[in-house]
């Protein structure tokens, strides 16, 4: 199933909502207060292709295999699963990655639809956001109107992997909302609603984050406290429409490459620090850095099918080539899906381009573009390997002594050996052209290294 199919099952026909009266609910007298609901209404959604409720876990079932995550994340909204036993007055230091997601211009729905339909549409969007966050091992914490707060990370997950999960969740949210859900709603409602999404992300270490049980008596909530957590809502507010704002905690901890970010520009000037730029106890501004995630560039790194991440339309033969990365673990070749997790240093990698012969696939010109980023890479930042294949024979053109071409199971496999050396995010891109420089295929794999 594709993202398009899942969205069609869950969002087509949202405009067709009828009402029927439900049984009146009896009121209950509380201390000093009388509560009575009277006549409630049950929404009966008449969908052309889906049942009355979103098919829970369908986005998860589509997304998780691409990130090599087993099973489903069935955690309910609320307390982080490791902290359910935290009593009132207790605190606990635990790192976390905090996410705030806000759906922009959703208030306009109230001007276009009856409120009953507005409820259904907004609820469906939030349900999808919850499932996408859970697909990347996030823990939805709280709903606030048309916004969602979530946490990533736990004691048995590395900090690096939690950050990668959060960034991947932000990029996947943007992809599915902007390219699938919002267009489906526009078509169904018959209006260009101009919905958008803004996301804030930041990481806080153990000494920066305290979890506590806040509240009184039965009115309690276990949540996180600390500057990185508190600032994430402000990051979301500063994010441009349809992108995510990354906080200093993420930028610094994994040495996230500037090439995959953009500056925040306000009134023609770059905004380098989160605003308001609060001061510390010495009265000095904290100057907490911010950068926008470059969604267009990072989206290309997601391990989804080319059609799903909107790359197939620019290439001629998306289905006659396949680009993969393998890591050697315990003397075995293990598939590593792009940006799916952080790898240790000193691991051998093999990039493989499979070429499936077919009509139109003749002689080829192939370039592998390696790009390292970050402080550890320093001068070792980029290298290109160029080869051509003529009459099914490999011709090495540039820096290609280590490349090899094998015939296997009816296809040709071109291999490029590499190694994990530098901390951060690094990429290998392949570009395949035919005669007259026609673009046959292009794909890119991101490798996170601890």
From Swiss-Prot:
Subunit structure: Homodimer.
Pfam families membership: AGS_C (PF18134)
pH dependence: Optimum pH is 7.5-9.0.
InterPro entries: A/G_cyclase, AGS_C, Nucleotide_cyclase
Gene3D superfamilies for this protein: Nucleotide cyclase
Domain Guanylate cyclase: from-to ranges: 97-236
Name of the molecule in the record: Cytidylate cyclase
Span of the signal peptide: none
EC number(s) on file: 4.6.1.6
Primary location: cytoplasm
UniProt family annotation: Belongs to the adenylyl cyclase class-4/guanylyl cyclase family. Pyrimidine cyclase subfamily.
Annotated positions binding Mn(2+) 1: 102, 146
Binding sites annotated in the UniProt record for Mn(2+) 2: 102-103, 146
UniProt function note: Pycsar (pyrimidine cyclase system for antiphage resistance) provides immunity against bacteriophage. The pyrimidine cyclase (PycC) synthesizes cyclic nucleotides in response to infection; these serve as specific second messenger signals. The signal activates the adjacent effector, leading to bacterial cell death and abortive phage infection. A clade E Pycsar system.
Outcome following mutation: residue 102 to A: Loss of phage T5 resistance, no cCMP production
Reaction(s) catalysed (UniProt annotation): CTP = 3',5'-cyclic CMP + diphosphate
Domain comment as written in the entry: Has an N-terminal nucleotide cyclase domain and a C-terminal nucleotide sensor domain (AGS-C); removal of the latter leads to loss of phage P1 and T5 resistance.
Gene Ontology BP terms: cyclic nucleotide biosynthetic process; defense response to virus; intracellular signal transduction
Ways its activity is controlled: In E.coli strain MG1655 transformed with both genes cCMP appears between 15 and 30 minutes after infection with phage T5 (at protein level). No cCMP accumulates in uninfected cells.
CC per GO annotation: cytoplasm
């Amino acid at each position: 199933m594709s993202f398009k199919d899942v969205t069609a099952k869950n969002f087509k026909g949202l405009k067709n909502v009828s009402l029927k009266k439900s049984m009146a609910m009896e009121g209950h007298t509380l201390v000093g207060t009388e509560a009575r609901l009277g006549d409630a209404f049950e929404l009966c959604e008449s969908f052309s292709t889906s049942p009355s409720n979103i098919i829970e876990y369908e986005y998860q079932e589509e997304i998780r295999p691409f990130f090599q995550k087993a099973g489903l994340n069935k955690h309910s909204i609320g307390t982080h699963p490791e902290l359910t036993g935290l009593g009132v007055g207790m605190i606990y230091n635990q790192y976390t990655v905090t996410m705030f997601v806000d759906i922009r211009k959703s208030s306009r729905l109230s001007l276009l639809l009856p409120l009953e339909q507005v409820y259904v549409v907004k609820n469906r969007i939030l349900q999808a956001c919850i499932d996408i966050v859970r697909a990347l091992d996030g823990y939805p914490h709280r709903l606030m109107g048309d916004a969602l707060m979530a946490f990533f990370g736990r004691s048995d997950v590395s900090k690096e992997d939690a950050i990668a999960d959060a960034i991947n969740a932000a990029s996947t949210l943007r992809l599915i909302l902007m390219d699938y859900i919002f267009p489906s709603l526009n078509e169904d409602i018959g209006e260009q609603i101009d919905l958008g999404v803004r996301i804030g992300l930041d990481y806080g270490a153990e000494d920066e984050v305290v979890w506590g049980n806040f509240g009184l008596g039965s009115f309690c909530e276990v949540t996180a406290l600390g500057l990185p957590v508190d600032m994430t809502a402000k990051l979301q507010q500063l994010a441009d429409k349809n992108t995510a704002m990354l906080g200093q905690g993420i930028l610094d901890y994994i040495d996230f490459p500037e090439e995959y970010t953009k500056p925040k520009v306000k009134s023609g000037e770059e905004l380098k620090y989160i605003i308001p730029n609060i001061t510390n106890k010495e009265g000095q501004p904290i100057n907490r850095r911010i950068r926008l995630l470059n969604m267009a560039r990072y989206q290309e790194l997601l391990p989804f099918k080319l059609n799903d991440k909107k790359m197939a339309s620019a290439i001629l033969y998306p289905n006659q080539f396949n680009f993969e990365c393998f890591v050697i673990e315990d003397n075995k070749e293990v598939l590593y899906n792009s940006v799916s997790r952080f790898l240790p240093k000193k691991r051998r990698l093999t990039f493989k381009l499979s070429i499936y012969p077919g009509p139109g696939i003749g002689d080829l010109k192939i370039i592998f573009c390696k790009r390292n980023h970050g402080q550890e890479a320093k001068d070792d930042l980029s290298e290109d390997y160029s080869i051509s294949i003529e009459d099914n024979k490999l011709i090495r053109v540039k820096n290609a002594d280590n490349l090899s071409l094998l015939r296997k199971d009816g296809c040709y496999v071109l291999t490029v050996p590499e190694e994990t050396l530098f901390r951060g995010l690094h990429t290998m891109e392949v570009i395949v052209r035919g005669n007259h420089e026609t673009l046959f295929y292009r794909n890119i794999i991101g490798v996170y290294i601890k």
